[in-house]
Amino acid sequence: MPMQSGQCWGDQRVKYLTEPIEGMDVLVTGAGRGLGRGIACFLGQVGAHLWITSEVEEELEKTAENIRGSGGWVKTRVIDLASESQLSMLTRDVKQGSSRLVAIINNAAVLERQSLQHIQRDSWEHTLQVNLTAPVFLTRDLVPLLSDEGGSIINISSRAGVLGFADQTAYCASKFGIEAFTRCLALELSGSKISVNSVTPGLKIKPTSITDADVVALQSTTSQAWSDPAILGPAFHLLACLRGGISGCRFDAITLANYIADCGSELTLEQLHAVAEYVLPGVDE
């Protein structure tokens, strides 16, 4: 059972591998808005070198300005992740330009609300390409950069990938796929210095698929209030520092961030397993 906020215990028998990310390269997709922007800006503040992507140049530059404004280092790539050729260009650029890639955060996602009766093939295929196919092949091509010294792969999931929701068939299928991909890759890389985990952001965090303009429009028709994704920064910082030992888990970002606030970031393997929503058997044994 996951631990609740405010519960701390200190069994120090088992440790896991971590490495500071200060001065190291981290790739965050979908960093032009929402959760992706919050993750990138927080990691920039703690000294990571950021590679960030978005399909919208104006939004991406806003994120980059925030990172540079706090003294951070960032490279931007405007990219349509549904394009195989553009995805290949991104992996080429990272391979050629990264001195030490330590974390891949597959965050970019699109969400089109359509019932099965009304779903169109092009919409279905685009959702799967951005939300699932791109993370799989981006990770495949960049894993060799992590292999020697280790690293962390963080796949952004959703409650839609755990529960399923009406009128979100393509999105839910893609997020269930992300959960399966995370578990399969964790098993394949078991025993290495590479951690593979998924994260559900929580309902209070504005989805990356919702633009800043959408937020303004929604505020006139709903009482929905989103929290600043920066509050999740400590959770993603901790996960980005992992180098094996914690893998095949699904974390709720808000729960993990609250636990870190209560207990600090020097957590044991048992504590992280206890706070995880799901732990894949056999990976860390």
Summary of predicted features, one role per range:
Residues 139, 174:
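Active-site helix of classical SDR
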Residues 144, 187-188:
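Alpha-helical segment proximal to the catalytic Tyr-Lys
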Residues 117, 163-169, 191:
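Active-site loop immediately N-terminal to the catalytic Tyr-X3-Lys motif
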Residues 158:
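Residue(s) in the substrate-gating loop at a strand-loop-helix junction
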Residues 115-116, 123-125:
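Substrate-binding pocket helix/loop in short-chain dehydrogenase/reductase
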Residues 191, 198, 215-283:
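C-terminal helical subdomain
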Residues 32-34:
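Conserved glycine-rich cofactor-binding loop
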